[in-house]
Amino acid sequence: MNMSAWALPEYIEDILPAEALKIEMMRRRVLDWLFVNGYELVGPPLLEYVESLLTGSGGQMNLRVLKVVDQLSGRMMGLRADMTPQVARIDAHLLNRKGITRLCYAGSVLHARPSGLTRTREPLQIGAELYGHQGLESDLEIQRLMLQSLAIAGVGNIHLDLGHVAVFRGLIRSTGISPDLEMELSGALQGKDKAALKELCAGLKKQVDASVREALQLLPELYGDENVLTLARSALPSYPGIMKALDELEMVASELSPLVDTLAFDLADLRGYHYHSGMVFAAYTDNCPNAIAVGGRYDEVGKAFGRARPATGFSMDLRELSGLMSSDSHPRGILAPFIKEDKALEKKIEQLRNEGQIVIVALPGHENDAGSFNCDKKLVSENGVWSIADALI
């Protein structure tokens, strides 16, 4: 057999029955929870024109999108790498509501390259977005919802990191440096690359005040418990935007601390800096080097679709979460015989299935295959009455 007939691309995998069931049950539980919290389900397309996929998401998204040529129009299309911009487009352009809108989603996304050595290129993204409210109340609602969703998915020992892009932005906006240099600085901070940060700041001596350069180089050190905020207030310039951001972090932390095992502040966390506009957050758990859920405020993304709206949201990868869960045994079923025109048997099978039980009808020649069907029970007839009995596996 030709190996290429069954080989898959790197970092692309099939999902086999046991994991597929685990993922699907997790997806249902999380979506049900989002639904009772007032979040409406939307389903953006897997494929869009590249211009739409990249609108408002910054240049970094361009490297993550797999592109194909539309054979109908000749235009370049892309497979979505993140559903967040798509949902923002739906809110801004299609729903066009005046008040608050709560939306949720679940679906596969595709990355041109894996985001980490242990990550798939085809995550199953699930998340929620809240549009139309700019206060801390919506930030808290979304972050609380994220933590509750992780708990519902079965994740324990949650560590929450909180950051705020307004701290870095407040320092930079006072300098007048170019957007390209701003992105270089944000990249060095996000990567905690102190050497690169020092070199960049050294090149700013003539145009940036020494206190700001020192503050920029201090940001990677501002990671840890509530003492980080105390140090930041004393060491960073007391610009109103920075002080407001620190106050917001403190208030949110006081509300969320009871919901997590540990909580830390990271003032150099600039994940998604090209579109985030306020608080950012990431959840971690034991035995996983990657963030298991991420989110933040992104008030300007809708503007690219013709309607700027305050927005905050979170997303997580169900496939990654599934890998953290212990493998539950596959639910057992009930084996039923194949008997033509037995109305009592048909009625019993229908009743059991309506109750949520798995009933597998053994096709002719396979009556003794209870074990291969994962059945530990069987239907037996006594005096014309069908009932459940133990099956020998």
UniProtKB/Swiss-Prot annotation:
Coiled coil: none annotated. Pathway: Amino-acid biosynthesis; L-histidine biosynthesis; L-histidine from 5-phospho-alpha-D-ribose 1-diphosphate: step 1/9. Gene3D superfamilies: Bira Bifunctional Protein, Domain 2 (3.30.930.10). InterPro entries: aa-tRNA-synth_II/BPL/LPL, HisRS-like_core, HisRS/HisZ, HisZ. Pfam families: tRNA-synt_His. It is found in: Cytoplasm. GO terms for cellular component: cytoplasm. Its main location: cytoplasm. The keyword Phosphoprotein does not apply. Belongs to the class-II aminoacyl-tRNA synthetase family. HisZ subfamily. Required for the first step of histidine biosynthesis. May allow the feedback regulation of ATP phosphoribosyltransferase activity by histidine. Heteromultimer composed of HisG and HisZ subunits. This function is generally fulfilled by the C-terminal part of HisG, which is missing in some bacteria such as this one. This is ATP phosphoribosyltransferase regulatory subunit. It comes from Nitrosospira multiformis (strain ATCC 25196 / NCIMB 11849 / C 71).
